[in-house]
Structure formats: C-alpha cells, structure tokens
From Swiss-Prot:
Entry protein name: F-box/FBD/LRR-repeat protein At5g22660
Residue stretches spanning the membrane: none
Gene3D superfamilies: 1.20.1280.50, Ribonuclease Inhibitor (3.80.10.10)
The keyword Heme is assigned to this record: no
Classification via InterPro entries: F-box-like_dom_sf, F-box_AtFBL13-like, F-box_dom, FBD, FBL13/AtMIF1-like, LRR_dom_sf, LRR_FXL15/At3g58940/PEG3-like
Organism: Arabidopsis thaliana (Mouse-ear cress)
Keyword Transmembrane recorded: no
Taxon lineage: Eukaryota, Viridiplantae, Streptophyta, Embryophyta, Tracheophyta
Superkingdom as given in the UniProt entry: Eukaryota
Keywords: Leucine-rich repeat, Repeat
Spans of repeat LRR: 157-181, 294-317
C-alpha cells in the first residue's frame, strides 16, 4: 500500500499539522477576505488570520465604512506590539466616508508599516492622506492611485525604495518634484499622468539613486485636449538602468547623465499630429535633443510611431552615434525601411537586431542603400525579422540584405505569417538560395503565432 493511499484513508490534515507561523505566512499571500474565511475551519483557525502581517482589503466588500473600521481596528489591535508588513486598501463606492478611513490609515502607518497601497477607483476620492505617510521612516514601498496630493511643508521618506504614483492630482507645480527628491534611496519609480488642467505640464525627475523609471501619459484616455508646447519631461538620474517612456503628449524630453549600461523602452510621439510638422526646425530640435539624451543606451526597444518620426528627422538631420548599443528591438513601417541603413550606421557595435515590420508598401519597392553599415561588417551576430501579416515580399528583400551583407552573422530568424507548412517550406528554400556572407550563419523560419 502506498503512503499516499494510507494518508487519504486516514484523513490526515497536512496543512493543519504545520506550525502557526507557517500557516500565517501562507494566509498572508491571500486577499484578507479569503484569509478570514479560514476562521470557520476549527477553533485553532478562528483567529489565525489576525496573525498575518498583511491586510489586503476592498472596502466595497463591507456594508458601510463603520463596519469596515470595526473590522480593521480589530485587525490592527492584534499588532500592538509588532510591525505591520503591508496594507493594501481599495474602494470604489462614493458612499465611503474618507474622513473616517483616513485616521485608520494613519493608525496603520504608525505601526511601522513597510508597504502601503491606496487604490481609489473613482476620480480623486481621497482628498488628502495623513501626514504620517509623508514622514514615515519605515515605508519601503508606496503606491497611490487617484489621490489628491497637496503642498507639503516637509517630506521625509528615508527608506522608501519603490514608489508608484498613478493618475493623482498635485495641487502645486513643485509637489511631485519635492516628493521624489525627498526619497534619498528611491530605486523604482512609476508615474502615470493624466492630460487635464490640474496636471503639472513639466515633469522633473532628479534622483541620484533611481534604477528604474516608468513614465506614462496616454492622451487618448483623457477627455481634455491640450496641443500646447508646454508639456515637457526632464530626467537626471545617473544610476538609471531601465527607462520606459510611453507618452503621446509631451513635446520635449531632456535626458541627462544616462549611464552606459541602461536599457530603454520607448513609445513617444512628441505630440506630433502630422509628420510634416517635422519640417519645422523647432520640432526637429526636440527630436535631436531626445536622441542625444538616449545615445549612451546599451539596449533599446522602440515603437513604430517613434521610429517613423525619427526616420523623417533623418531626412533633414544626422543621427547621433549610439556606440554602446548592442541590442535593438524596433517596429518599422515598411514604407520607412529605406532609412534602416542610416539607423544601423548610428549603432556601430550592434550585436542583436529584432525588426517587426508594420504596414504595406503601396506602389514602390523598398530601396536599401548600397552602403553597408559598419555593424554588419564587424559586430552583428543575431537578426530576427517578424512579419505578422502576409506582405508583398518586403521581409524577403530584407532577409536577402542581411544575409548577403552581414560578415559575422551567427543566427538569422524569420518569423512570418505562413498559411501552411508548404508555404513555410517554400520560404525556407528561397532563403537558402540567397548568398550568405557568413558561412557560419544558421537560418531558422518559424510561423508567426497570433
């Protein structure tokens, strides 16, 4: 008889045989509402949920704020002599009396809480937070969503390492800048902004400790329309190793002191509604400054929208050199592929290239310069071309270009929308007819998976 069979017949409860501290750790990984339901299992489990140092609660699950406060106070009272690890509170209903909730949040913060998340799901429900939040010596991470942040007399968050500020309102222009600068060991910052009259148009991020920065503005989700040139982003973070910019509103991006090992994910449009706006020197100047600020990057992922603007910029201005760049993942509109050699020429040490092709050629065929970029002759080892839609052969012309001109190429991969195995086989056979500059190159064709 197997041991498992014996256990099943004896009805042994392995979970309940664990010590309390392990059970508490298991319960802390559940939403509090689920953890509380375990109290009906037995006398031992009745109050076990109160020993979990995490409160993850949705106020909407309670009949009213008074019921919630009664429940939450009971929970906090169980931590009078110990630290609360995490408080995650969310709500949506407008009936919530925040002036009842705020003192309770203050009480929780005084228990030397390490992680705090306040998530309002209706517009700017929380008009203020207790001052203890901004003076906490214990907070390690802070996430605020739809919160009104007023002018701070004093802010000090000496141990805060992670901060996510999402769709909040800042009553004064310097509020966010002061907030960020008051976190001397901040490593991870996310800022999601709205496009409205209340949002400060110039965002300045200055930090000597920041490692990861994500900035987001999506004007398509906002009712307010502002085509002014006042929206700007200024970044000075010399320790930054990851930068994500998803911004279709800001006109200008000034990036200072980016380190040589940094990686970036870029999707910006400089608030350009018409590509011909780049005929103006002011618009081109903003693009040029942005590219110069990114020129020390090691690894970049760039959107088709941003690359289209850069390609038009290159018809008028030279591209700065990205000498540290070893990996580039780019979405390229096929109508802009004639500028690809120019982009590659600016990356003389590129080792890995991923191109995802978008759009269709209308009447003309793609024309690539006969001049071979330096990286193809000396450093480019891996190339992947992705063609999600069945095109008119641009991916094959591009494949031929790389196979015939890349001297040290080791791996070439074509990911294409093939309707059948037979069509996939035809693509392989055509690729094998192309002359290969690198005899060591391995060719791989895979079907694009939707």
């Amino acid at each position: 008889m197997s041991n498992q069979g014996a256990i099943r017949r004896s009805g042994e409860d392995r979970i309940s045989s664990l010590p309390d501290h392990l059970l508490s750790q298991i319960l802390s990984n559940l939403p509090t509402e689920n953890a509380v339901t375990t109290s009906i299992l037995s006398t031992r489990w009745k109050d076990l949920w109160l020993s979990t140092p995490v409160l993850d609660i949705d106020i909407d699950a309670f009949d009213d704020a008074t019921t919630f406060i009664s429940f939450a106070t009971r929970f906090l009272d169980s931590f009078k002599d110990s630290c609360l690890h995490k408080l995650q509170i969310s709500f949506q209903m407008e009936a919530v009396d925040m002036w009842t909730i705020i003192p309770w949040i203050e009480d929780a913060v005084k228990r030397r809480i390490q992680h705090l998340e306040v998530d309002s799901r209706i517009d700017h429900m929380i008009d203020t937070l207790p001052l203890t939040v901004y003076l906490s010596e214990s907070l390690v991470s802070l996430r605020l969503h739809l919160v009104m942040l007023h002018r701070f007399v004093f802010v000090s968050l000496p141990n805060l390492k992670v901060m996510h500020l999402e769709e909040n309102i800042y009553s004064y222009a310097e509020t966010m800048e002061k907030f960020i600068s008051s976190c001397p060991v901040l490593e991870d910052l996310t800022v999601v902004r709205n496009v409205d009259e209340a949002t400060e148009k110039v965002l300045r991020v200055s930090s000597q400790s920041l490692n990861s920065l994500k900035l987001v503005i999506d004007s398509s989700k906002c009712w307010y329309n502002d085509d002014s040139d006042d929206w700007k982003v200024v970044i000075d973070a010399p320790q930054l190793v990851y930068l994500s910019l998803k911004d279709d509103q800001s006109v200008s991006f000034v990036i200072n002191n980016l380190c040589s090992s940094a990686k970036a994910d870029i999707k910006v449009s400089f608030n350009v509604s018409d590509i011909w706006d780049l005929e103006e020197s002011f618009e081109r100047s903003n693009v040029g400054k942005f590219l110069t600020g990114l020129s020390s990057l090691r690894d970049m992922t760039i959107s088709g929208t941003t690359l289209k603007i850069i390609c038009h910029y290159l018809k008028h201005e030279p591209m700065p050199q990205f000498r540290n760049m070893t990996r580039l993942h780019a979405k390229f509109y096929v109508c802009d592929l004639e500028m690809l050699p120019c982009v590659l020429e600016s990356c003389p040490n590129l080792k890995s290239l991923v191109l995802k092709l978008k759009g269709e050629m209308e009447n003309e065929e793609i024309s690539l310069s006969s001049s071979v970029p330096k990286c193809l002759q000396s450093s480019l080892e891996n190339v992947e071309i992705i063609r999600p839609n069945y095109g008119s052969g641009e991916e094959m012309k591009l494949s031929k270009y790389f196979l015939e001109n890349s001297l040290v190429l080791k791996k070439f991969k074509l990911c294409r929308d093939c309707h059948s195995e037979e069509q996939e086989s035809l693509v392989v056979r055509e690729l094998m007819t192309f002359q290969r500059c690198s005899s060591a190159c391995e060719i791989n064709v895979v079907r694009f998976q939707r």
